[in-house]
A protein has these predicted regions:
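C-terminal outer-membrane/trafficking sorting elements
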Residues: 6, 18, 433-444, 448-509
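Fold-level signature of zinc-dependent metallopeptidase catalytic domains
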Residues: 154-210, 223-235
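Active-site-proximal segments of metallohydrolase catalytic domains
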Residues: 218-295
Length: 509
């Protein structure tokens, strides 16, 4: 083993603080948001991230009080770690289109790259932007980290698209309201008045649908007047191809009604014209369809007779992380679930840990599982069928907006109201089960080029950097809880950092 003197830089302060009451002014600048663009590339059973850029954008629409995500929702999660104090200062769960693509047959035979982008409040000092993916045991795993350096010359402030913003309904400041930015897809410049009317129709839909109707004053709706060259959107089955600003299309994964876009950077570029918590894309089409991804975007057509129900259904996905409650045995999306763990979505259960879901809403005389009969209409129980599966997955009530466009069930109502509250300027308590200890070993950035920052919970620890064959390449003495290790002389490749019986893989570029 080659012993090398490695430069260790004490970053000071103990391992990650878990208090949810983060002081915004201490860690963030009130000057907009930081956006990190990446590509997620992979196949059905593997993936990796490629960093694209940091963008400093003019608006931040989130709460300045509830900076730590009080929920445990999403297939993915972004964390912001203050690099000097190793403090968790922001987190948010989300879903991606890439994760759904991984369930398709195509993903078993080829690799694809999907655009992904996360926006966080603008850090005052150096901070790590960490991306995590939920594994099939229901636990988040760190898969990528990048150091944000405020003085880095390539942090761009360039705004690709600048368009007028139309205030559809504004009830208060961005930090105290749920901010929805509405984007037009397939509306030409001459059709902007029609788009504005469709935006008003969307607000009217929310104002008539509980629980949004009772909380309509907690929402802001703004629309970006961004025209497309041509009217309509792509319909691959009929070889209809339209030049639009967001490049949306039907037939996602060959499902006729599934309307999405892979051009997520363009979505974020247009949305950057206004503060937002949620992005809603209105499609200029009379065809039935839409799509929704938690804290990613919602999309629905504006001209179909079922548009009102689709608007609310898709927003249930995007805003509250609600799952589809219907069965669709032929859908590959059922592969997203592991039946020996609880789904992360609030409105599904495998009954593995029903007490952690909605057991408190079930009357003592209701059997679990609950027979799917008229006797139990309008009753909270556990009805088999949901999450595209016909067996071993259970939903709260027989009917719901997330199943068949009925009114939201009691569980979905409760979840939506909790998410609305978390977007306010009132501090929301984080669930105790989410205050689990952070990893006792953290290695950032990953991938790395010149150095890695190693955070441990024990000082004076002997550590090693190993190759994938287990051969020790470097021996390191960690004298502090936070240490910077220069690795510029290491060849490119994958390495394992080993200390106190724990290991972390990292990539040297």
């Amino acid at each position: 083993m080659k012993k090398t003197l490695v430069f260790l830089f004490a970053l000071a302060f103990p391992l990650l603080s878990r208090a949810q009451n983060i002081n915004f002014e201490q860690y963030f600048l009130d000057e907009g948001s930081l956006r990190m663009d990446v590509f997620q590339c992979g196949t059905s059973d593997s993936s990796h991230y490629v960093f694209e850029r940091f963008i400093l954008e003019p608006h931040f629409g989130g709460s300045k009080v509830n900076l730590i995500d009080p929920f445990n929702f999403g297939t993915n999660r972004v964390k912001v770690i203050d690099a000097q104090t190793n403090t968790l200062i922001y987190s948010r769960g989300y879903n991606t289109l890439f994760r759904e693509w991984q369930t398709t047959e195509e993903a078993t035979r080829m690799e694809r790259c999907y655009e992904e982008s996360v926006s966080v409040p603008l850090p005052r000092n150096e901070a790590y932007i960490i991306l995590e993916i939920r594994n099939f045991n229901g636990e988040f795993e760190e898969v990528f980290s990048k150091l944000y350096e405020p003085n880095e010359m390539f942090n761009t402030t360039e705004q690709r698209y600048v368009f007028p913003v139309y205030d559809v309904m504004v009830n208060g400041t961005p930090e105290s309201k749920v901010d929805i930015v509405i984007l037009p897809e397939g509306y030409t410049a001459d059709e902007m008045p029609q788009f504005q009317q469709h935006c008003q129709n969307l607000v009217n839909v929310f104002a008539q649908q509980e629980p949004f109707a009772s909380h309509i004053g907690d929402f802001n709706f703004r629309a970006v007047l961004a025209p497309s060259e041509e009217s309509g959107i792509d319909i691959p089955a009929s070889h209809t191809w339209v030049r639009t600003i967001l490049n949306a299309h039907f037939y996602t994964f060959y499902i006729d009604r599934y309307c999405t876009t892979r051009n997520y950077f363009s979505v974020k570029d247009v949305a950057a014209n206004a503060p937002y918590d949620q992005i809603y894309i209105l499609v200029n089409s009379n065809q039935y369809g839409g799509g929704g991804f938690y804290n990613f975007y919602s999309m629905s057509t504006a001209g179909n007779m079922s548009s009102s129900s689709v608007i609310v259904h898709e927003f249930g996905h995007a805003f509250a992380g609600l799952a589809d409650e219907y069965e669709e045995p032929d859908s590959p999306l059922g592969l997203l679930y592991t039946l020996n763990v609880e789904p992360w979505e609030a409105n599904l259960t495998t009954l593995v840990d029903f007490e952690s879901k909605w057991a408190d809403l079930v009357a003592p005389n209701i059997p679990i599982p609950t027979p799917n009969t008229n006797q139990y209409n309008n009753t909270v129980g556990a009805f088999e069928g949901g999450g595209y599966l016909t067996e071993d997955m259970y939903r709260p009530q027989r009917n719901c907006m997330m199943r068949n466009y009925a009114p939201f069930c009691a569980v979905c109502n409760r979840t939506i109201e909790a998410v609305i509250e978390a977007h306010s300027d009132v501090l929301v308590s984080v669930k105790p089960e989410l205050l689990l200890p952070e990893p006792s070993l953290r290695v950032c950035p990953n991938p790395a080029t010149d150095f890695i920052d190693v955070f441990v919970d024990q000082v004076d620890s002997q550590a090693e950097i190993l190759d994938l064959n287990g051969k020790a390449i470097l021996s390191v003495q960690l004298k502090d809880m936070a240490n910077r290790i220069v690795i510029s002389d290491l060849p490119q490749g994958v390495y394992v950092f080993h200390v106190n019986g724990e290991t972390k893989k990292f990539i040297k570029q």
